[in-house]
């Protein structure tokens, strides 16, 4: 699978070529890309599926059955977490020995220039300039190549890589859909390695019409 910043580009190219698409989560790198993918899939008429492997997990299907039959009574609070507790779990992956500019196509990794421009414009318009690295993007970096999940320039962070699994599981079990509100906090509190993506995240989701709150935490 490609890095997050390539997902929508590949999905749209495949759809325009008339290919049905199975896209690993996350669907996109930015919010605008999400709508772009939706439009292209609609226009081309191909079959599209977003991949969450948890959909095949027996315990989630059993939980849906139990809650759906009312065996637990009203559910008002959901708590889920992702705790990795190791450098590898926090995306500090090994750098393959001998890797260099002659063995890695950096421009190809960086992605479509138009997508990059749209990303820069999106981040700037949302006053998130401090999280982007326009200077670093043009510089070859083994850390960024092998550990790309640590930078917003290529990644969707804890939410796009890990929370997405937990949220999909909850949605599969309880059919919660889109929440009324979501509030997050966190930061880069442990891995002081230059990353821009938080290594600690707390998110609260609210569904007032269902008297339901979901708490998510990740480290």
Regions from the PLM with identified roles:
Residues 6-9, 32, 36, 55-58, ...:
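Extracytoplasmic/secreted proteins, especially bacterial periplasmic and envelope-associated proteins
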Residues 3-4, 8-56, 70:
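Beta-strand-loop-alpha-helix segment that lines the small-molecule cofactor/substrate pocket
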Residues 62, 74, 79-83, 88-219:
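Contiguous beta-strand/loop segments that form the cofactor/metal-binding neighborhood of enzyme cores
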């Amino acid at each position: 699978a490609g890095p997050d910043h390539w997902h929508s580009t590949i999905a749209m190219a495949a759809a325009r070529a008339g290919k049905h698409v199975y896209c690993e989560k996350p669907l996109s790198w930015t919010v605008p890309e999400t709508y772009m993918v939706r439009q292209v899939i609609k226009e081309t008429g191909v079959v599209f599926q977003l991949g969450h492997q948890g959909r095949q997990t027996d315990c989630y299907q059993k939980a849906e059955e139990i809650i759906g039959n009312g065996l637990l009574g009203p559910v008002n609070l959901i708590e889920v977490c992702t705790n990795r507790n190791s450098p590898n779990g926090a995306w500090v992956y090994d750098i393959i020995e001998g890797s260099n500019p002659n063995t890695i196509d950096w421009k190809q990794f960086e992605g479509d220039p138009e997508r990059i421009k749209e990303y820069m414009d999106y981040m700037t318009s949302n006053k998130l300039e401090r999280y982007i690295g326009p200077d670093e993007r043009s510089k070859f970096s083994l850390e960024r190549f092998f550990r790309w999940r640590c930078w917003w320039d290529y990644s969707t962070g804890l939410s796009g890589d890990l929370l997405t699994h937990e949220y999909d599981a909850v949605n599969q079990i309880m059919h919660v859909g889109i929440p009324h509100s979501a509030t997050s906090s966190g930061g880069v509190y442990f891995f002081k390695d230059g990353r821009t993506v938080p290594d600690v995240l707390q998110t609260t989701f609210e569904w007032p019409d269902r008297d339901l709150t979901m708490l998510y935490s990740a480290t």
